[in-house]
Amino acid sequence: MERSLPAKMAKASLLLLSCLSALTFAVDSSAQSTGFLSPVPRASCGANDHPESGLQGQVPAFLRAAGFNGFNCNLELVGQARGDGANWQSAEYIDRADRKCAYHGTSLKTANRTTLGVSVVDISDTANPAVLNHLTTISMVDPWESLKVNVPRQLLAAVNARNGNGGPEIDIYDISLDCRSPQLLSSLAVGKADGSTGIPATIVGHEGNWAPDGLTYYGGDLRTGGGRYYAIDTTDVRNPKLLAFWKPSVAIPHGLSVSDDGMTGFFVAQGGTPIASLTNPAVAPTNGLLVYDLSQIQNRLPNPQVPQIGQLLWKDGSNAQHSIPVKIGGKPYLIFVDEGGSGTGLSSVSQATGACAASMPPFPMARIIDISDVRNPTLVARVTQEINTVKACKLVLPDITGLSLFTYGTHYCSVDNKQNATTLACGQFNSGIRVYDIRDPLHVREIAYYNPPGTTTASPGSDHVRNGGWKAGGPDWCSSQVHLDASNGTLWTTCQDNGVLTLKFTNNVWPFPESSTPPGQQN
């Protein structure tokens, strides 16, 4: 483990590393067997819905070729603000005047752009979401997956990401008075060599998240020194400082979450297993969950250490994305999401084909993990559709022919209330928005979905367009978090080509009697 210590502390750092290497952590052995996966039960759709015509989660090749018109089941479109499109992340805040605002990233400059930066969208009227302005400070030009709101301190922040090609800056905005007009508090590079912004170190943005109290922002750097996690002290929001950085014990960093008390971190190991080794029990998995003791950072001890205290890794997924600590029926669980299927990579055609040949699920999925004992997390459930079963391979592989990456599967998920989670909502590549009943985590069931129509013109703020994956009339990448509202039975999210979408549940499927959506408790 790499520690953010002066050179005189290097020996102590090596001692910590040797102690950690002696610990034994868990491997999800069930994931190493073949043909294990079962899909969740399908949603029962209403008479006026347009349900999927093939497998659950599938957009068949012939529909793509003809121009995909969308599917819906118990969810219907209420409003849309396409703008220039969107990219990877979205966030929400409701201010003291009860105005609801959406924030979402857009890609770096592409042809026909009108405005760069994070879009500020008024979604108070769900039928008429309106893009008001854009945030264009250095980290907001392309925050990638780091754009996050902290509700207790009423702050919006992002790091300079640009898909890991950014820099050490963090931008922090005050959104307390009027969420429609964020006020810049700081835009600073942390870790400067002169020590003026915390310990001297090189970091580059990509992913990130707040500690619940808003006093620390944690980031995942994919690039520097083979990848490192880092912690920024945001106690003084006008003068953020780098507190610590460390290298994960396996794979590279990505997303993360922190327990309510700030003491425990549920960080991801973004790894994968070569196709040839998927069924080889002698090859250990490198993708999954790393549990850290964050107490020394939370308590602001000098030269904080970040020991790893737990682990759960698997082979039936790769490129671990993020986690959400929740309680279901009073018991602690972790929602965990991958963005790649079995193998290595981002669900390319070759990866999916190889996974199918190994009788492993080809696409990424969400998982529910029991964290009653954070030192020994255990898998409870896999949450996925029929497209991700081995027997479906021959039917879905033709759908993705000619695509480069992110062909099917999860990216981000949210719950209704982390303190009493009843509902899981996930944005997926090509399969749209999927919503699940998780009140019984052993028997998850799908209750609704909405897969938007393919766009026929390019959205210049979409990374789906920027990286060449967009095809006119093809299905969208719904890659950002989903934001539920139990007070009126709606949700909003962004899909990269379609932009901001506001949706309403129909046929009385949601909210459940015990569902609630308090601010700041969804992801």
What are these language model-derived features?
Residues M1-M9:
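N-terminal secretory signal peptides that target proteins for export/translocation
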Residues E2-R3, F25, D122:
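Short intrinsically disordered, low-complexity coil segments enriched in acidic
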Residues A10-S13, Q89:
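Residue-level detector of intrinsically disordered/flexible regions characterized by low predicted structural confidence
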Residues S13-T24:
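Bacterial N-terminal signal peptides
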Residues A26-A31:
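Boundary at the C-terminal end of the N-terminal hydrophobic targeting segment
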Residues Q32-N523:
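Feature marking well-ordered beta-strand scaffolds used for ligand recognition
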